């Protein structure tokens, strides 16, 4: 019998998740299907309940439903609790739903695979929304020496720094307080997609700075264009994070680790990168 999985979102037609998980299943010889479900904005809970009632084994959740998914769970991982959002649902043997958040693990895995080890690094996280919140604990657990957060609205950055203060060395800084020459800079803000980058000082970058944009597309992102012009030594977009978080979800469902590297190359080829 084929096990059913799906990704829920609105919109969802652009999702790469069905392709990614279908390739993971082929690699690991798993008997499973994976589809994309367009959930009504006002009917997400009903869509999820119907899916699991009809035999669904697990699901991914994307915008705008990650916070709603959080509230539907009977059990939550520590990552999901701190993120305040769920992107992975697992149906347990007793029928209860466990929620997890694999976004941050996907980010860390991709940075360490493609850029540099995060251990003992000074890291700047740009943005203080849901994408940032979901990644802070994995970044701290990766052993960063210092994690600074900056955001247009400073209060949001302060709230995140306070929430995660017991997990590591984390500070909220205004744009004028930022240090010089960070080891790694991560952009979690989606503002660049609309052509409105946060006005960051170029002094935060030197010739040894690695930059990572959680966004991705067929062209170099605006943030990475800016970072390269400011002298960053290397930049990456978030396509690998997408594949990395999917690999973590796949492991939670099937207890097997897929090869993310080959699937990421297939995606890059499809995007003409």
Curated annotation (Swiss-Prot):
One of its GO terms (biological process) is amino acid biosynthetic process. NADP(+) binds at residues 78, 127-131, 151-156, 214, 238. Pathway: Metabolic intermediate biosynthesis; chorismate biosynthesis; chorismate from D-erythrose 4-phosphate and phosphoenolpyruvate: step 4/7. It catalyses: shikimate + NADP(+) = 3-dehydroshikimate + NADPH + H(+). Keywords: Amino-acid biosynthesis, Aromatic amino acid biosynthesis, NADP, Oxidoreductase. Belongs to the shikimate dehydrogenase family. This is Shikimate dehydrogenase (NADP(+)). The lineage of its organism: Bacteria, Pseudomonadati, Pseudomonadota, Gammaproteobacteria, Alteromonadales. The gene is aroE.
